[in-house]
Swiss-Prot record:
Protein name, as recorded: Spiderine-1b
Tissue expression per record: Expressed by the venom gland.
Superkingdom per UniProt: Eukaryota
Organism of this sequence: Oxyopes takobius (Lynx spider)
Upper classification of the organism: Eukaryota, Metazoa, Ecdysozoa, Arthropoda, Chelicerata
Chief location bin: secreted
Annotated region described as Linear cationic cytotoxin domain, given as residue ranges: 59-99
């Protein structure tokens, strides 16, 4: 264990030094670009820059922007009347709500219409999750503090190993 910590420290030290050198190279190139920009500004008067900006604003096609916005609004209004879109929106809202409710709570607490934990909820084993879900731990057993285990949708290679309730 001590060897692993020493190795981790050496790797961290190496990464800090490597990124430090990279940062100084980036800072030097950014400083050069800034110096060139300041030289350019020094050569050009502010009045001519303002005149150029005003001319660009006058040339801009505001009518095209407004017509595109109007078309986008009409498409959104048409989509909002579509039944499939409404179903997808409802599903998305429910999924976001389930993911947002990913805090720990007592097993058996109602989540929606179920008496089990929602997808994305922190879990300790498969028995915390609904029968059609499983408890997934991305970090395995070696680092549970860094990545929490959550209830996930059961896929073909994963199964809920909790014994059925009697």
């Amino acid at each position: 264990m001590k060897f692993a910590l020493v190795l981790l420290g050496i790797c961290a030290f190496y990464l800090v030094n490597a990124t430090g050198d990279l940062e100084t190279e980036l800072e030097a190139s950014e400083l050069q670009e800034l110096q060139e920009a300041l030289d350019l500004i020094g050569e050009t008067s502010l009045e001519s820059l303002e005149a150029e900006e005003l001319e660009e604003a006058r040339k801009f096609k505001w009518g095209k922007l407004f017509s595109a916005a109007k078309k986008l609004y009409k498409k959104g209004k048409k989509l909002s009347k579509n039944k499939n879109f409404k179903k997808a929106l409802k599903f998305g809202k429910q999924l976001a709500k389930n993911l947002q409710a990913g805090e720990e709570h007592e097993p058996g607490t109602p989540v929606g219409n179920n008496k089990c934990w929602a997808i994305g909820t922190t879990c300790s084993d498969d028995c915390d999750c609904c029968p059609e879900h499983h408890c997934h731990c991305p970090a395995g057993k070696w680092l549970p503090g860094l990545f929490r285990c959550t209830c996930q949708v059961t896929e073909s290679d994963k199964v809920n190993k909790c014994p059925p309730a009697e």
